[in-house]
Amino acid sequence: MPTRQTNNFTQAKWIWAQQPEYTLYNRWVEAQKEFNLSDGFMQAHILVCADTTYRLFINGERICDGPVRFYPEHVRFDRLDITKSLRAGDNNIKIIANYWGCKATTRIPVHAGLIAEIIVDNEISAFTDRSWRVRNGNWETNTPYSSFSLGPYEYYNAEKGEESWQQAVELFAAHEGPWQDLTPRDCPFLTADSRELKLVQTRKLPKRAYWYSFPFTRLIHKVPNVGAKILPSGGAAFTTIVAPTDMEISYRSFILEIYINGIKMESTFKLNKGDNFVSFISPRPNGFQADDPWFLLEDVRAAELKYRNPSGSEGMFCFIHPKASEETRNMPNHPPRDEELQTRIMEGLTKLRRLARPVDLKELEASAEYSFTSSFSPTIDPHIPAIFDAADSDATEYMYDLGTQSIGYISLEIEAESSAEVVLYMIEYITEEGIRQHTIQGNTYYRNGFGLKVPAGTTKFRSMKRRSGRYVVVSVKGETKIAGIEMEESVYPIKARGSFECSDSYLNKLWEISARTLELCMEDTYTDCPLYEQNFWVGDMRNEALFAYNVFGGYDLTKRSLKLAAESLDHQDLIVCCAPRYFTEIIPIWSFLWVVALKEFYLYSGESDAVLENWAACKTNINNTKTYINEEGLFDAPFWNMFDWGEIDWMGRRVVLFNSIMLGGALDSCIELCEVTEDQEFAQECCEYKASLITAVNKYFKNGAYPDNTDNLNSGSQIT
C-alpha cells in the first residue's frame, strides 16, 4: 500500500544506468516509468532532482528543466503541480539527466544520480527505484568543456541506434549519499516564451578539418572530478602527421606550444612530405581554461593529412605527463599551496620541451619522471565558427536574428537526404563591417553552441542547455534543410512595477537597455551575464538587486541569492565571491557587501524572516574577519583583494585600505540589523570593532586622501 507523503522524499531512491563509475565525465541517462491512475483523482505533484541537470516529460509533454544551482550539502529539489498533465489510466514519466562530472563555477557535480516521487491525492503513486527502465542517452560523452562555468559541450548523435532499456541501478536512499539537506526549490520556475527568429544571411563555408581538443586533466587524473582542483597538470601529446607533399597550413591554438620535427611553430604548420613528428605541449598549470587546450588547422588541405600514433597503438595520439601531477589526485578541492610539489610539477612540464622531437617511446614508458598513455583520441569539437567565405564548399551557413539578445533553449528540425552534421552557435554582436564577436577568441573561452549528427530523414532536437545571444548561426553539410528553428526564452518571471520616462530619448533608451539586461541576468540567482558565465557573483548580486527592487521587485530571488551565498560558509570562513563553485575563492569586499545586501533587502522588502534566517551566517561572516586583523588594526589577508578592476586588484597586496573601509560599512549594516534581531550585545561588539577600524584607517589619511594600500606598516603606497 502506498505510503502517505509529506513535502519531501520518503520512498524514492537515487538511480542511474549501470556505469563502471558514477563520477565519469559528461554522462547522460534516460529513465522512464509507466504507472496507472484510477478515475477521479483530484491533485498530483512530483518531486524531482538530479545531479547535475534534468528535463522532465509526462505523457510526452515537456514539463520543466532543473534543478536550481545548489551546494551538495544543501540540495534544492523541484516540486511541481502536474495534475493537468496526468490522466486516468496509463501514464508515462520520462526524465533525461546529464551528470557533468567536471569542474564548473555554476554547479558542483559530485555523483551521477536522479530522483523522483509522484504524489496523487497525498499518496505515493510512483517513485524512482530499480523498477524504472533506463538507458544511456545519445549524447556523445567525449566532448570538451563548453566553458569553465557551464559544463561539457553538447553534441547529440541522432545516428546512434537507441540502446535497449535496462533495469535502473539504485544508488542511495533519498536522504543518503553525497546529497544532504534536501529541501524544495526556493524560487519560481523560469519562463518559456517563444521568440521569433528571422533569417538574415546565407553563405557557403569551406571544407575544413576538425578542431581538436585535448582532455589533459582527465588523462592525468582518470577520475575527472579531480580536475576541479586548481593544480598544475599539464602534459604533452604526440602524433605523426603524414603529409602528401610539402605544405604550410595556418593554424590557431589555445595554450599549446606546437613543435614539428623539433622546431617550434608560431602560426603555420610547416610539414614535409611524408612523416612529421608533432608535439603539442601544455606547459602551464590547469585552471579555469588551461586543462582543455585545442588547435585548429585553417586550410581545406588539412583534410588531406593523415594521423598515426607514434606508439603504434590505436588512437591518434599518445600522451605523457609528470608523475608528480598524480600526487594531486587525493587533495581537497582547494588545498593549501604546496610550493615543493608545484616546483616539481613545473620543472617536469618545462622538461617536456626537450621531448619535442622524435623520441624512443620505450624510454618514456620506462621513465621514473613521467607517466605514459600509449593511446587517446581528442575530444569531439565541431564548434568551428567560420570567419571567411569560400565558393567551393561542402557546407552552408544560415544566420538568424532574434532582434535583441535573449537566453533560453534552441530547438531544431532538420531534414537530411543522408547522414549529416549540424553545428549551431550564438553570438551577441556583429560590427557595422560585418565582423562577428565570436565567443572563442583571445583569452575568451566559451563554446556557445552545440553539435548535432543526424541520419537521413527528419530529426527534431531541443538543446538541454540554456544559451544566450542575439544571432543564431547554423551550419549544415550536404543536402540538408533546416525545416524549423525555435528559441524559447527562459528567464525569471518578472513583474514590471517601475518605469522611467523623460524628455531625453537617449536616457529613455538607456533605461530600457538596462532593464532588459537585468532581466537576462535573472534566473535561479542574479548572474553576471547571460552568455559567457551565468555565474552568481555576490558583489554583482548586491548591485543588481538594488535595481530590481524598483523595476521588477524580485524579492524572492534576492532572498534565495542571499541564502545560497550564506551556505558557502560550510566551505570558507568568509562568504565566497561566487556560489556554488568548485573552489572557494574570497573577494573580501564582496563578503562585506553581502551584509550590506541583507540590510538593503530588509529595507526594501520589510521581510524580517530573511534577516533572522541568515543572522547566524551574518555573525559568523563578521566574527571571522577578526582573524585577519593585523597588529596595526587593518584587515590583512592573502585573498583576491579586488575593488573594481583597477591596477591594485592584481598586485597581490595583503593590506589594501578599501577592505578595512568596506568592512566598516558592513559593520554599519550589521548594527542596523541588530535592531531587527534584537541582538544588542552583538551591536555593541560591532560598534567597538568599527571604532577600532576607523582609528587604524585614519592613520593613513594624508593630503586629503587615503592610499589604496600600504607597502609596509610605515609608509603609504605610491598608488592612489
Outline where the language-model segments fall:
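Active-site acid/base region of carbohydrate-active enzymes
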Residues: 127, 433, 479-513, 519, ...
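Short, well-ordered beta-strand elements
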Residues: 279, 664-667
